[in-house]
């Protein structure tokens, strides 16, 4: 599922950049085409020294890319729901998360004072704090939203080179640290069941449903994410 996870990261970051008037294609070729969408490139192994502070890039061979046959049993259940549905659910959940924390979210990445030389350390510290007490779907949404905001902040500050790096860091963390939990909790199918089909928009119309499952995870994730950021110098 590693390549599919990377596809989710690229799609989400592309979406967030487009909301600010930027195009993913402006930045996907910045560092040797390392962050192109997976359906356009063959899996590559990242050179550890190529990115400041970036851990080795692990791309497992996956028959799941682009609907290829020969799926392993661990992937079958998750592929029942099309990748497009997962992407859409992530976009909607990310928008809802940012809407709820718009005021704080507008400044959160600027608190890090990132530079190309310190960006990975900042990313790692914030993400480790976010998941320090465990993983849930709300925190996974916060993880994606943080990465998107960090990319936008990088471009705004003319550090476009960081966009491809952030995409790689996110995909690596997702594969190495979050994928086991995702598999154990129903896969992305479960995420789509909870957050898909415009659930974020519908939840604003029906507060009882919203408070029951969405707000709990999102609020905790928001508090953890914002707290970890604003507690930093």
UniProtKB/Swiss-Prot annotation:
TM annotation in the entry: 210-226
PTM comment, free text: Proteolytically cleaved by caspases during apoptosis. The cleaved protein, lacking the BH4 motif, has pro-apoptotic activity. Phosphorylated on Ser-62 by CDK1. This phosphorylation is partial in normal mitotic cells, but complete in G2-arrested cells upon DNA-damage, thus promoting subsequent apoptosis probably by triggering caspases-mediated proteolysis. Phosphorylated by PLK3, leading to regulate the G2 checkpoint and progression to cytokinesis during mitosis. Phosphorylation at Ser-49 appears during the S phase and G2, disappears rapidly in early mitosis during prometaphase, metaphase and early anaphase, and re-appears during telophase and cytokinesis.
Tissue spec: Expressed in most tissues. Bcl-X(beta) is specifically expressed in cerebellum, heart, and thymus. In the ovary, the predominant form is Bcl-X(L), with a small but detectable level of Bcl-X(S).
GO CC annotation, single: mitochondrial matrix
Motif (BH1): 129-148
One Gene Ontology term from the biological process aspect of the record: cellular response to amino acid stimulus
Protein keywords: Apoptosis, Cytoplasm, Cytoplasmic vesicle, Cytoskeleton, Endocytosis, Membrane, Mitochondrion, Mitochondrion inner membrane, Mitochondrion outer membrane, Nucleus, Phosphoprotein, Synapse, Transmembrane, Transmembrane helix, Ubl conjugation
The protein's role, per its UniProt record: Potent inhibitor of cell death. Inhibits activation of caspases. Appears to regulate cell death by blocking the voltage-dependent anion channel (VDAC) by binding to it and preventing the release of the caspase activator, CYC1, from the mitochondrial membrane. Also acts as a regulator of G2 checkpoint and progression to cytokinesis during mitosis. Isoform Bcl-X(L) also regulates presynaptic plasticity, including neurotransmitter release and recovery, number of axonal mitochondria as well as size and number of synaptic vesicle clusters. During synaptic stimulation, increases ATP availability from mitochondria through regulation of mitochondrial membrane ATP synthase F(1)F(0) activity and regulates endocytic vesicle retrieval in hippocampal neurons through association with DMN1L and stimulation of its GTPase activity in synaptic vesicles.
Motif BH2 per UniProt: ranges: 180-195
Motif BH4: chain residues: 4-24
Domain observations: The BH4 motif is required for anti-apoptotic activity. The BH1 and BH2 motifs are required for both heterodimerization with other Bcl-2 family members and for repression of cell death. The loop between motifs BH4 and BH3 is required for the interaction with NLRP1.
Family that this chain belongs to: Belongs to the Bcl-2 family.
Quaternary structure (record): Homodimer. Interacts with BCL2L11. Interacts with BAD. Interacts with PGAM5. Interacts with HEBP2. Interacts with p53/TP53 and BBC3; interaction with BBC3 disrupts the interaction with p53/TP53. Interacts with ATP5F1A and ATP5F1B; the interactions mediate the association of isoform Bcl-X(L) with the mitochondrial membrane ATP synthase F(1)F(0) ATP synthase. Interacts with VDAC1. Interacts with BCL2L11 (via BH3). Interacts with RNF183. Interacts with GIMAP3/IAN4 and GIMAP5/IAN5.
Gene name, Swiss-Prot/TrEMBL: Bcl2l1
Organism the protein comes from: Rattus norvegicus (Rat)
Motif (BH3): 86-100
Organism domain of life: Eukaryota
Region Disordered: start-end pairs: 27-73
Taxonomic lineage of the native organism: Eukaryota, Metazoa, Chordata, Craniata, Vertebrata
Phosphoserine: residues carrying this PTM: 49, 62
Protein name, UniProt field: Bcl-2-like protein 1
GO molecular function, one term: BH domain binding
């Amino acid at each position: 599922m590693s390549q599919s996870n990377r596809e989710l990261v690229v799609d989400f970051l592309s979406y967030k950049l487009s909301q600010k008037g930027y195009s993913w294609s402006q930045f996907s070729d910045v560092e040797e085409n390392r962050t192109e969408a997976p359906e356009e490139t063959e899996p590559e192994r990242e050179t550890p020294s190529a990115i400041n502070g970036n851990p080795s890039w692990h791309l497992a061979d996956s028959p799941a890319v682009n609907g290829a046959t020969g799926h392993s049993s661990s992937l079958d259940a998750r592929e029942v729901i099309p990748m497009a549905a997962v992407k859409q659910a992530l976009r909607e959940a990310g928008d809802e998360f940012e809407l709820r924390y718009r005021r704080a979210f507008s400044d959160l990445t600027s608190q890090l004072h990132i530079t190309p030389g310190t960006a990975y350390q900042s990313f790692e510290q914030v993400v480790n704090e976010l998941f320090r007490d465990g993983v849930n779907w709300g925190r996974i949404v916060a993880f994606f939203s943080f990465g998107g905001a960090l990319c936008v902040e990088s471009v705004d500050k003319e550090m476009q080179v960081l966009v491809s790096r952030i995409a790689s860091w996110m995909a690596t963390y997702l594969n190495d640290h979050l994928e086991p939990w995702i598999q154990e909790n129903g896969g992305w199918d479960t995420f789509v069941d909870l957050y898909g089909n415009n659930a974020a928009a519908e939840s604003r119309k029906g507060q009882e449903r919203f408070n029951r499952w969405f707000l709990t995870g999102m609020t905790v994730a928001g508090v953890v994410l914002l707290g970890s950021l604003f507690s930093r110098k």
